[in-house]
C-alpha cells in the first residue's frame, strides 16, 4: 500500500524538489500540496518541468484536512512556521518531517537566540529526532517528528563524524569552509541572489554568525561526547546547486592518509549514499548534482599535522529534500534508496 504524503509549502525550491522526487517514488502517493501564493493552480503551472508527472492542484493550508488524509507530512517552510503543523500532527498521531530549523536545536533558548523567533512548541523538542540517517538511523526508525538537517550541517557533519567518533582530532581546532549554490537562498526575491549580483562573483557571508553554526556544534558534540566549537564560514557560489565544504582539523596524534581513509571506509561501510573517494580523488559538486550522494575525499598535511576533508552534496537533495525522503523511507520500513537511487546528470 502506498504511503500517503502531503507537502506544506510545496512551491519553494525544497518543496518542488520533494514533489519531483516523490512523483517518481514507487511507494508514495502525493495527496496534497499547499502554498500561500499559488492556490488554485496546477502544480505544473508553477513548475512546468513537472508537467505530466503531477496533476495535483495547489491548495491553501488546512491542517486538520491535511493530517486526516496523510500518513506523513513534509513541512518545507522557513523557520518559525512548522510548529502549528507539528502540534496538529502530535494530536492526530501523524508523522511529520520538518525541512526547516524549528526542531533541530534541542535548547529553545539557543533557537530563539539565533533565529530571533519565539519557539511555541517547546514541549515537542525532546521527542524530535535529528534526521541524519548516517548518524541517527535507529532513532529515525521510531520517530514521529523528524528535524531534517540543514544543508551546510549535512555536509560538515558527514565530513567530520568519523574523525570525532574515533577521537582522531583536537575538537578545538575545527574550521569549516563551505561554498553553496544560489538555490540555497530559496526562491524569494532578494538583492543578494539577483543574477547580476551573483554572476561572476564569489563572496563570504554571515561570517561567524551563520544560523547553522549551533546546529553543527550540537550534533558534532553528540558524536564526540563533548562540547565542540567550530569556526564556520559560508560562501555563495555563482552556480545553482551544490555545496562543497572543506574542513580542517589538527590531528590528535600523527596518522597517515590511508589510515584515516580506512577509518572513513569503515564508518560509512554499507551506507547507500556516502561515497568515500579513493586516494588522489577529491569531490566536485558536479558529480553529485541531482543525487542524494555525499562524496568525501581527504588528505593529510604532514607538515602541519592537519587533516583536510572535503565533502560535496547537492544542497536541494542530500542537503534537503532527498534526505527528507530518505528519512521517510526509514520511518516506513522501505529500502533507503527507494525513489532516490542513481547517478546525477553530467556534464
Swiss-Prot record:
Tell me which domain of life the UniProt entry assigns to the organism this sequence originates from: Bacteria
Reaction equations catalysed: N-acetyl-L-glutamate 5-semialdehyde + phosphate + NADP(+) = N-acetyl-L-glutamyl 5-phosphate + NADPH + H(+)
Q: Which UniProt keywords are listed?
A: Amino-acid biosynthesis, Arginine biosynthesis, Cytoplasm, NADP, Oxidoreductase
Pathway the protein contributes to: Amino-acid biosynthesis; L-arginine biosynthesis; N(2)-acetyl-L-ornithine from L-glutamate: step 3/4
The protein's matches in InterPro entries, at most eight in alphabetical order, are given as: AGPR_AS (IPR023013), AGPR_type-1 (IPR000706), NAD(P)-bd_dom_sf (IPR036291), NAGSA_dehydrogenase (IPR050085), Semialdehyde_DH_NAD-bd (IPR000534)
The top EC class, named as a word, is oxidoreductase
A GO molecular-function term, please? N-acetyl-gamma-glutamyl-phosphate reductase activity
Please give the GO cellular component terms listed in this UniProt entry.
Answer: cytoplasm
Name of the protein: N-acetyl-gamma-glutamyl-phosphate reductase
Amino acid at each position: 500500500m502506498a504511503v500517503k504524503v502531503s507537502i506544506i509549502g510545496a512551491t519553494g525550491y525544497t518543496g518542488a524538489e520533494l514533489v519531483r522526487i516523490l512523483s517518481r517514488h514507487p511507494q508514495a502517493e502525493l495527496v496534497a500540496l499547499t502554498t500561500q501564493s499559488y492556490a488554485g493552480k496546477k502544480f505544473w503551472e508553477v513548475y512546468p518541468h513537472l508537467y505530466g508527472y503531477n496533476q495535483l492542484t495547489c491548495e491553501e493550508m488546512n491542517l486538520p484536512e491535511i493530517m486526516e488524509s496523510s500518513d506523513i507530512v513534509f513541512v518545507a517552510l522557513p523557520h518559525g512556521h512548522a510548529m502549528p503543523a507539528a502540534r496538529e500532527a502530535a494530536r492526530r498521531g501523524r508523522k511529520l518531517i520538518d525541512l526547516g530549523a524549528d526542531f533541530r536545536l534541542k535548547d529553545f533558548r539557543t533557537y530563539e537566540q539565533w533565529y530571533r523567533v519565539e519557539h511555541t512548541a517547546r514541549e515537542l523538542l525532546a521527542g524530535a529526532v535529528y534526521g541524519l540517517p548516517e548518524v541517527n538511523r535507529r532513532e529515525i526508525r521510531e520517530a514521529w517528528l523528524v528535524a531534517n538537517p540543514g544543508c551546510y550541517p549535512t555536509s560538515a557533519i558527514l565530513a567530520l563524524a568519523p574523525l570525532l567518533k574515533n577521537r582522531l582530532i583536537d575538537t578545538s581546532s575545527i574550521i569549516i569552509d563551505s561554498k553553496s549554490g544560489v538555490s540555497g537562498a530559496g526562491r524569494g526575491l532578494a538583492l543578494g541572489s539577483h543574477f547580476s549580483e551573483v554572476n561572476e562573483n564569489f563572496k563570504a557571508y554571515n561570517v561567524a554568525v551563520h544560523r547553522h553554526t549551533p546546529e553543527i556544534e550540537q550534533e558534532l558534540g553528540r558524536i564526540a561526547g563533548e562540547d565542540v566549537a567550530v569556526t564556520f564560514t559560508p560562501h555563495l557560489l555563482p552556480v545553482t546547486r551544490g555545496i562543497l565544504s572543506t574542513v580542517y582539523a589538527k590531528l590528535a596524534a600523527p596518522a597517515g592518509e590511508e589510515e584515516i581513509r580506512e577509518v572513513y571506509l569503515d564508518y560509512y561501510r554499507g551506507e547507500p549514499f556516502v561515497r568515500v573517494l579513493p586516494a588522489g580523488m577529491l569531490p566536485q559538486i558536479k558529480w553529485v548534482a541531482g543525487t542524494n550522494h555525499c562524496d568525501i575525499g581527504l588528505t593529510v598535511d604532514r607538515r602541519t599535522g592537519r587533516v583536510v576533508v572535503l565533502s560535496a552534496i547537492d544542497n536541494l537533495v542530500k542537503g534537503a529534500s532527498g534526505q527528507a525522503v530518505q528519512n521517510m523511507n526509514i520511518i516506513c520500513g522501505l529500502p533507503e534508496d527507494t525513489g532516490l537511487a542513481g547517478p546525477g546528470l553530467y556534464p
